[in-house]
Amino acid sequence: MVLAQSRVSAGVGSPHCSGSGGGGSDYFPWPASHPGNPQCSFSTAFLASPRLSRGTLAYLPPALWSSLATPSALLGSSCAPPPPPARCPQPRALSPELGTKAGPRRPHRWELPRSPSQGAQGPAPRRRLMETMKGIVAASGSETEDEDSMDIPLDLSSSAGSGKRRRRGNLPKESVQILRDWLYEHRYNAYPSEQEKALLSQQTHLSTLQVCNWFINARRRLLPDMLRKDGKDPNQFTISRRGAKISETSSVESVMGIKNFMPALEETPFHSCTAGPNPTLGRPLSPKPSSPGSVLARPSVICHTTVTALKDVPFSLCQSVGVGQSTDIQQIAANNFTDTSLMYPEDTCKSGPSTNTQSGLFNTPPPTPPDLNQDFSGFQLLVDVALKRAAEMELQAKLTA
């Protein structure tokens, strides 16, 4: 307002004033002068003054422009100076951030909207705006700082936590001595259980994880020297990935050693047999006694057969009788043995067959308790099958004859 009034006073005393309207500038349509009222010609002289540029006129608010364009409204009947408008918005020439186009002023994107009462107060709204912006920035900065502080413990990357990583420290000497003593006492099995780890954790005032890590490192670094001082091989008392092949070979050797003992255990009942031919496993089993008296009667053994496991060759332990038995017993035995899938059909040993119970070979309960001198070896099973088959073939030959 002050700038506009100074411009008006400068235009009145200007020697370049002319009473004709519409002169000076062709940017705005200038109103015509009033010849009946020569005192009002200063308005047109002000508008036609060359001191007013287009930019200055462009910065004039619409309310001031309307008051200048209508002298009757500006001066009244007595052409008195116009009263300063109380609610007139601030001229645009005082705000450098605004454009040069005429029209209503638009607020900046970071500027709060002005009320009409704030127009004449000067830069006070801007100060409040700056204070408000500082508060917003401070609040956002505090929030980001809080978020950053919350993210710091969760960041496990080496680049982010390198500056705040703690320096590596050693365990207390008392705790290390307790762990060393336990390791030396259990050097042949240096693998503490969960209860022992908890006890050591209480004694050393360390966490269970620290105790576990210490033993992992001690078994790799300290334990081999302890075992070598005792003259022991460390690979036999530690479980490591490097010694996995050695442990596998030792386990294979132990398994092979167990297998080597199995034939000896199987051969022991063969030598304790009191009757039967030569127990040589590599030869075909075809016992042929030289005389009828050489066949000794073995104790009675009940017939039990595992049909599901051995379907083709059912083994049975049966009673062997002498040659001088009656023929009616032989015919009863011939009726019982009808299986033709038995092996060793070429054996023609003259031996009496064995008698069986009612249901034959299928897990029948024993009619009498077995004797103490039973022989369940595999060799005797084969001998019994051969003798049984030979007796069956002999009976068939007699019946056909």
Curated annotation (Swiss-Prot):
CTBP-binding motif (motif): residue ranges? 153-157
Keyword tags: DNA-binding, Homeobox, Nucleus, Repressor, Transcription, Transcription regulation
One cellular component term (GO) for this entry is: nucleus
Q: Assign the protein's first listed, main location to one coarse class.
A: nucleus
Q: Where does the sequence pass through the membrane?
A: none
Stored SMART domains? HOX
Q: Which SUPFAM superfamilies match?
A: Homeodomain-like (SSF46689)
Residues folding into a coiled coil are none
- Which residue intervals are the DNA-binding region? 164-226
Its GO biological process terms? Answer: negative regulation of transcription by RNA polymerase II
Q: Where is the stretch described as Disordered?
A: 1-20, 78-127, 139-170
Q: Which GO terms describe its molecular function?
A: DNA binding; DNA-binding transcription repressor activity, RNA polymerase II-specific
Q: What does the similarity note say? A: Belongs to the TALE/TGIF homeobox family.
Q: How does it assemble?
A: Interacts with SMAD2. Interacts with CTBP, SMAD3 and HDAC1.
This chain's function reads: Binds to a retinoid X receptor (RXR) responsive element from the cellular retinol-binding protein II promoter (CRBPII-RXRE). Inhibits the 9-cis-retinoic acid-dependent RXR alpha transcription activation of the retinoic acid responsive element. Active transcriptional corepressor of SMAD2. Links the nodal signaling pathway to the bifurcation of the forebrain and the establishment of ventral midline structures. May participate in the transmission of nuclear signals during development and in the adult, as illustrated by the down-modulation of the RXR alpha activities.
Q: By what name is this protein known?
A: Homeobox protein TGIF1
Q: Which organism is it from?
A: Pan troglodytes (Chimpanzee)
Tell me the organism's taxonomic lineage. Eukaryota, Metazoa, Chordata, Craniata, Vertebrata
